[in-house]
Amino acid sequence: MELGLAEPTALSHCLRPRWQSAWWPTLAVLALLSCVTEASLDPMSRSPAARDGPSPVLAPPTDHLPGGHTAHLCSERTLRPPPQSPQPAPPPPGPALQSPPAALRGARAARAGTRSSRARTTDARGCRLRSQLVPVSALGLGHSSDELIRFRFCSGSCRRARSQHDLSLASLLGAGALRSPPGSRPISQPCCRPTRYEAVSFMDVNSTWRTVDHLSATACGCLG
């Protein structure tokens, strides 16, 4: 029997399985790569929920690639903030320095306090009204009484109230240029004297009320 072209031969039946077995691994790898590429480029284009509207966040694809690798989205990478340089520690607090205005105010306050104390001392030594309890029998008015009354009087210096006459008189007396009369000496400053008076009443030993006018001072001044 002759071998014809139209009939399959034993040689063609032997070559066909070898050719198909050689191409099958290549086709399988190409199909797998095509699926992985489509999934990585547009993982949600095939999902009907993505076309209909917003949907909950889906988990990233975890398809395994050839060689044991796993596909990941770029959005999963977390951007870490750049490291910040350490801030220098603040210097320790030093002793508080007093500012010049505060120092000036303190000095002025000290001077003002000194002046006020001097003024108080001068006022205490100056002409002013004073009072004291005294017995009526010691007044020298001829009344017999066991009572005590408050007697007000004036005392103190009037140097600050001196006039030009008083200053010149004191200078002449100090230089010996002015001869004073025998047994007397001129006064070179005013005298602290009462300027107003009041009456005082008391009871004597006979239980009789006595009133003395212009007995006690109520105001003082430098006179002369």
From Swiss-Prot:
Residues 1-39 form the signal peptide. Residues 40-111 form a propeptide. GO terms for biological process: axon guidance; cell surface receptor signaling pathway; glial cell-derived neurotrophic factor receptor signaling pathway; induction of positive chemotaxis; lymphocyte migration into lymphoid organs; peripheral nervous system development; Peyer's patch morphogenesis. Residues 96-116 have a biased composition (Low complexity). The keyword GTP-binding does not apply. GO terms for cellular component: extracellular space. Residues 80-95 have a biased composition (Pro residues). Residues 43-124 are annotated as: Disordered. Glycans are attached at residue 206. One of its GO terms (molecular function) is growth factor activity. Keywords: Disulfide bond, Glycoprotein, Growth factor, Secreted, Signal. Its main location: secreted. Disulfide bonds join 127-192, 154-220, 158-222. It holds the Pfam family TGF_beta. Belongs to the TGF-beta family. GDNF subfamily. Growth factor that supports the survival of sensory and sympathetic peripheral neurons in culture and also supports the survival of dopaminergic neurons of the ventral mid-brain. Acts by binding to its coreceptor, GFRA3, leading to autophosphorylation and activation of the RET receptor. Strong attractant of gut hematopoietic cells thus promoting the formation Peyer's patch-like structures, a major component of the gut-associated lymphoid tissue. Homodimer; disulfide-linked. Interacts with GFRA3 coreceptor and RET: forms a 2:2:2 ternary complex composed of ARTN ligand, GFRA3 and RET receptor. This is Artemin. It comes from Mus musculus (Mouse). The lineage of its organism: Eukaryota, Metazoa, Chordata, Craniata, Vertebrata. The gene is Artn.
